[in-house]
Amino acid sequence: MNILRSLILVVPILCVISCDSNSKKSSIAKVAVVFQEDSLKFTKSQKVFIRDVISKSEKEVRNFLPNLPDSIKVIVEAVDWDLDIVNGVTGRTETNHPPLVLVQISHNYKGGVIESVYQGIKATVFHEFHHLSRGWAIQDNKFSYGIPNAMVNEGLAVAFTEIYTGNINDVNSYPKEADRWVKEILALPLDADYAQWVMGEHPDGRTYIGYRTGNFLVRRAMKKSGKSILELSDLMPNEIIKLAGY
């Protein structure tokens, strides 16, 4: 009887502790949006809208990738760049510790800032937050050097974004020669030029080779292994390359 009485008293206490712990975790797991403005400004309504889109996107990504770090900071900057090929928005994952993502929104994109947000910011958040979930960042990257690692990590982020947002850009599409491109990348030296092979233009005229080839590689790994994009996102680059048959 005493044991039963003790259990009756202890269980509610444990529930309170557990609920309080979950509540604290929920309150921490959020994104802080900061606007960096120079000559180009955001209006008050634009800021409210942008912040709302980023916040909702963060919640969606966290449902898919529960290991996404807490307390992410997103710095949003207004730019006059030509970002038409990426729906008016671009970004980069700067650091893992603290989790920091930079987003640039073009004032020159078609209908303006709000149109950019509608078309591109959700896709950018999904892409960059996928990088955060894996530790793929510019300043404190968790992966070793080499274009193959970049190909896989960018390919995962591209495929994840396309699958869960439906936002597909031609700049990330892969050609029929993609298999040959993968083999080219796997044969590259560790010090191969990142700009040429991943996110810029190659001397032979090809563009964004790493993103496009990575998208192909990840899709092929999914098809051959039967694994989902979320399952692949838990694997190391060399494992994904093997699953794709290379």
Where are these predicted regions, by residue range?
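Short pre-active-site segment immediately N-terminal to the catalytic Zn-binding motif
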Residues: 107-124, 148
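C-terminal motif of bacterial Sec signal peptides marking the signal peptidase cleavage site
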Residues: 15-18
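Bacterial signal peptide processing site
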Residues: 20-22
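Active-site recognition of the HExxH zinc-binding catalytic motif
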Residues: 119-136, 158
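Post-HExxH zinc-binding segment in Zn-dependent metallohydrolases
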Residues: 145-180
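Pan-zinc metallopeptidase signature
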Residues: 189-246
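Auxiliary, metal-adjacent structural segments of Zn-dependent hydrolase domains
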Residues: 50-101
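Acidic/histidine-rich, surface-exposed loop or edge segments in extracytoplasmic proteins
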Residues: 27-45
